[in-house]
A protein has these predicted regions:
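Extracellular receptor-binding modules and their adjoining Ser/Thr/Gly/Asp/Asn-rich linkers
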Residues: 1-77, 81-83, 91-98, 116-128, ...
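Beta-strand initiation motifs
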Residues: 47-54, 98-106, 149-157, 201-209, ...
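Short loop/turn motifs that cap or connect beta-strands within the blades
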Residues: 53-62, 106-114, 157-165, 209-217, ...
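Short hydrophobic/aromatic beta-strand or adjacent loop that forms the aromatic wall/cage
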Residues: 89, 295
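Polyanion-engaging groove/track-forming segments
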Residues: 191
């Protein structure tokens, strides 16, 4: 016989097991084994509203100046904050996400006095976190490097960023250049938008030459890294022109240069946060729109070369708010906007945003804490596939600084057990060719190619953490058995 497929029986080549289906399963699709012994089609299931974990209390009192980063070297979440239960000292703590819960190690005081305008990001090249802030002692700008070890963290000494009065710090890691960029408002007379490129070595950081992107008194600065263009984007209020703007920065060595400004709003913004949607390949900004009753607003930006343009803004909530954050969830391919809802008792609230082209659509609002919520910041944890929110909240006159998780989507591809031999109705029993068998009712394969299970249930030669097996023909695959 000329074709191997002629040797295989219709449907499958052995190792078939009957399972009860949880949900409808199509013919020849990948399935995962559930904890109750049923099987479901491999898919990414969107959660709207998000599934929230329980709050984990970091300390009892209010916290301020929240900054959050994800340490991809240690698979940990780092939270930095002003601890009002301990003389307002600047403190950091390491969180471990397990399922929907997050637990914390011991806190570490990295500066025994107050600071303001705290910002933090993880430098993946060095495997360290970098914080930057305005020191209350001299009003100068400083940075420090933090090292995570297990569930603990320690910091190196202060390094001067700006030897003049500086504020509005925003730290972002540029993955293309392998450098950390610090944006801030600096001299002269606190009206210049300035940036420096930092190189982390051990527990310290050194900075290149100063670069200025505007002299128009920028405020409410936020930034993000666009991994598609390999650029960083800084968003700010142009307080001289009374408008909201953004500009693209290109890092080369220890220097940064800037393109032309793009306008995202004809009025000022108050408080902004910025993230990058790697699925849509767009920048997403959440900001308080001073041009529209201080409503919380979001907008999508597109980087092209050294320029950035914006789509049409969308109101998140029609009430005044200056307390919000936006983070991209790579599991759901959505952004999560978290905010204090002044129209609903100042409760902590979220909306899920879906970016399409230069537009964004929003889900209904979902409350995650029924109490006054302040100093919100979040970060996506790819290990747990959840966003971690850290914030200060007050319920019944008691203040607590807490963190909790939000799950926007769940994936079951790591539970891959085999391929269905025929369509199976929900709650019905049907045959599945399990790992170690040969499934011969798949389509679109290339013989002798290795295939992997993708998070959406498809088979692809693109590597993933789940090996499916090797194709024997265009319709048959020898399913790998390793567990």
């Amino acid at each position: 016989m000329s074709n191997l497929s002629d040797l295989l029986p219709a449907g499958a080549g052995g190792k078939q097991v009957d399972f009860v289906a949880s949900g409808t399963i199509g013919n020849g699709v990948t399935v995962g084994l559930n904890s109750n012994g049923t099987v479901s089609a491999i898919a990414t299931v969107q959660n709207s509203p998000p599934v929230y974990g329980a709050e984990s209390v970091i300390f009892v009192n209010s916290g301020e100046q929240t900054a959050v980063a994800y340490d991809s070297l240690n698979n940990k979440v780092v939270v930095a904050y002003r601890d009002n239960s301990n003389s307002s000292y600047m403190t950091a703590i390491v969180g471990t996400v397990s399922g929907s819960s997050i637990s914390f190690g011991s806190s570490y005081v990295f500066l025994s006095r107050q600071v303001s305008f705290l910002s933090m990001d993880f430098d993946a090249t060095a495997g360290k976190v970098v914080v930057a802030y305005k020191d209350s002692q001299d009003n100068y700008g400083y940075a420090q490097v933090g090292t995570v070890s297990g569930t603990s963290i320690s910091f190196g000494s202060q390094v001067l960023v700006s030897g003049n009065s500086s504020d509005d710090f925003s730290v972002v890691y540029d993955g293309t250049a392998g450098k950390t960029v610090v944006f801030y408002r600096g001299t002269p007379y606190n009206v210049a938008g300035e940036a420096k490129v930092g190189t982390v070595s051990g527990t310290s950081i050194s900075f290149g030459s100063l670069a200025t992107w505007t002299n128009n008194n920028p405020g409410y600065i936020s930034s993000a890294y666009d991994s598609t263009s390999g650029k960083v984007v800084v968003v700010y209020a142009d307080q001289s022109a009374s408008s909201a703007k953004a500009i693209v920065g290109t890092v080369s060595g220890t220097s940064i240069s800037f393109g032309s400004e793009g306008t995202l709003d004809s009025g000022l913004l108050y408080a902004s946060d910025t993230t990058y949607d790697s699925n849509a390949q767009r920048i997403v900004v959440a900001y308080t729109d001073a041009n529209n009753s201080n409503y919380l607003t979001t907008i999508v930006g597109t980087v092209s070369g050294t320029s950035i343009s914006f789509g049409t803004s969308v109101v998140v909530v029609s009430s005044y708010t200056q307390n919000s954050c936006v983070d991209f969830d790579a599991t759901a391919n959505k952004v999560l906007i978290a905010y204090r809802d002044n129209s609903n008792n100042n409760y902590g609230t979220t909306k899920i945003g879906t970016v399409s082209g230069t537009s964004i659509s929003l889900s209904s609002a979902s409350v995650f804490v029924s109490g006054l919520t302040n100093w919100l910041r979040g970060v996506y944890d790819p290990d747990s596939q959840r966003i971690v929110l850290a914030y200060s909240r007050e319920i019944s006159s008691q203040y607590k600084f807490v963190a909790q998780t939000a799950q926007l989507a769940s994936q079951n591809f790591t539970s891959f057990v085999g391929i269905s031999d025929a369509a199976i109705s929900s709650a019905a029993s049907g045959s599945v060719t399990i790992k170690g068998g040969i499934s011969s009712n798949v389509t679109g394969l290339t013989a002798n190619s290795t295939y992997y299970v993708q998070s959406d249930g498809t088979l692809s030669t693109t590597s993933s953490s789940v090996l499916a097996g090797k194709a024997l023909s265009s319709t048959s695959i020898n399913l790998d058995y390793t567990t």
